[in-house]
């Protein structure tokens, strides 16, 4: 490499074409090519394109008891929940279940003051790469997406952003966690999948 040589600029389109060509020749596998393509789309994608819609979000309500919150947490198995007051558009904060269970036995007022943290609000037009950088810097991996009127469109997590780059993570994790199924056929015989 000649350090005095002029740098050759390569466009996004040329890199995409090289990745496709490498994939067709078998030099780059399909998953690697998909990640390269997703990387270039990442900065063009608004967060509302992949946010979990407000109708699909499990919420905690300020007028519920801690017992109701615990039941909701056990039934839905998420790690962070928006806490709303009166309407879904009035998010007063977010609750991480680690904090909720760490303060088990405390009053609801204590939980609201010490465990429910301020929500990170973002406009629906924010690009995925901007939110990714913001979450990385702030270490806040949960954002409430708002429409132009301040109403909640949905939520986006760091996991959602990563899935835009590398594909669905939950299915991959679920496959790893699945144990081979087995069934007993007779006293000395078992059928084991896998």
What are these regions, as identified by a protein language model?
Residues 6-194:
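Soluble cytosolic regulatory domains appended to membrane proteins
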